[in-house]
Amino acid sequence: MIGSPTPLVGCRTLARVLAASLTIAVVAPPPSAAAQSPLRHWTEAIDARFAMSQPAIAYVIRVDSTDLSGFDVSVTVRGKRDTTLLAMVAHPEYDDRYSRFVRNVRIEDTTGRAIVTRLDSALWRVVAPGGSFVVRYRLQLPAETGGERAAWKPFLAPTGGLVGGTHTFMYIVGETLAPSYVTLELPASWSVATALTPTSDARTFFAPSTLVLVESPMLVGRLREWRFSVDAVPHRVAYWSLPDAVPFDSAAVVAAIQKLAREASALFGRLPYREYVYQLQDGAYGALEHPASVSLGARSRELADGSAAFLGELAHEYFHTWNLMRIRPVEYRDVSYRTPPRSRGLWFSEGLSMFYSDLLRRRAGLPVSTPTRAAHLETAIARYLSNPGNARLSAERVSVAEYGDDPAALGDYSASTHLQGELIAAMMDLEIRHATSGRRSMDDVMRRMMERYSGERGFTGRDVERVIAEVCGCTVSPFFDAHVRGARAIPFDDYLRYIGLRAEVTWRPALGRDGRPAPDLRAFPYELGDGAGVRLKVSDPASAWGKAGLHTGDRLRAINGHPIATRDATLGVLRQLASGDTVQVEFERGGVHRSATVVMAPFDRPFVQLREVDAPTSAQRALRAQWEKGAP
């Protein structure tokens, strides 16, 4: 194969891809340095490159409006060897294993002798003499349960849906740097919002690699759209709404999103993409970040209310554009169908994104859930203290378990990578500000991390420690030994004193929304999907469940005589419990049937107030004022 067109040239079929000649376009610098990746040689500024040994790949996704139970996919390959492996990517965090829903796989070629064989759940072998073939399959969407839909999962409705991403495409194993084209066959009234590169055909898009392909899902349907620019870089907000959507002030929503982008650009000095797409979905929860887009649940009622929660989640996911998509843990490498190794660095990826979700909104003057940074820190410290696992489990250990398949990995404790990492960031930010007399902050750490670890090599915990030490000119090894690699409680007052504050902690009876004593629900049911039933996760051995002799991994049989069938049904039973109730639990452990009596006794929760230390110095007061303003 001599070449293929640049992304600016349309491609309806693979034949057109192969027939066109290669166009070489040298990228000229824009008026600003925004959105430009560092280049090491002038040859790297070529818009599209192809090796003669690479296959030509074209995908087609077809949505039939008369059957929205799934969609059809075809992948056309030319120029590959006689035997090819096709696979579906395993996501390092949210591996939903959608290969389970691939149906009716079949193959076509000019010889009529091609064969496709499933080798594993997410792996297929293709034998096609001549190396050219078309594989077709259907992705049968799973039935929705619980009345809620995750914003990152594919769906179809009469007015739109979400397709593509890791849930949809088979890729060629060993050819992850091969470019491809994707053509969408959709109802005529539907439009497309995706981070994939557009072509002259409005329904065809270009992906320079498998990673870009699977990290660029496509929101399709009757979309509302708004656009803005930051540093001359275009941003696109697409919204898919339900039929009963509540009207909201779209100008205010888009303005808030734009302010976040401006603050992030100001922090890092530039934007790392050529265009960004916000894929907002009504009737969905949660979100998932991508290198140049985000899939985010955005209920119209929350948008109408000006919800701080929506902006908080958006800011968190958007910050992942830098912190995870580019500044990535060393364990995160190129795509693979194999489950990737668990990362020890998610405390940084998730925790720092939580830290900046709050900070960027404050800098932008956007709604937040607490009036001041001090109040926000009070809430975070109280949450940390309320769960002993946060101090008994190291941030690195919790990172490894964060997206694991088995909640039993942490025993009868639970902990939050997001919370641990946020508080580690908060304390290190205070350390840096103190050591540099307010001249530097965590902002300087993020910029240096972006410069060093957004390329071929990801970061380790030692790298983070080294960068912080360089920025502050101080030693932080004892802190990392104790709270990142080790499992000791963070001594908050040691760092709060830099700004003339201390944490006053009191323990009070836990109350529900009605003001009455709350039931002790420091345990929850879960399922592993292995058909073994519902298990119990104890999050605190000092809870009523732990005191009754229950342990994480116990298989639940009945609660108060009600047979346990599903996780959702179990949650329904637990929500009916009140403080003072006595609960009879039938369970199985090690193949032995057992029973336990759980007494829903009252329990205490921590409340934290930041108080001023005695006789704070002028330097402490000045540093506090700078910190409270969220100054860089």
State where each predicted segment sits.
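Surface-exposed beta-strand/loop patches in extracellular or lumenal glycoproteins
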Residues: 69-99, 170-187
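Juxtacatalytic substrate-recognition/specificity segment
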Residues: 75, 225-346
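Post-HExxH zinc-binding segment in Zn-dependent metallohydrolases
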Residues: 291-302, 326-327, 338-390
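Extended, low-hydrophobicity, Ser/Thr/Pro/Gly-biased non-transmembrane segments
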Residues: 92, 138-220
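Zn2+-dependent metallopeptidase catalytic core
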Residues: 97-107, 140, 167, 177-197, ...
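A surface-exposed beta-strand-loop module
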Residues: 63-65, 93-153
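N-terminal, polar/Ser/Thr-rich
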Residues: 35-66
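C-terminal recognition in membrane/secretory proteostasis and scaffolding
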Residues: 357, 367-632
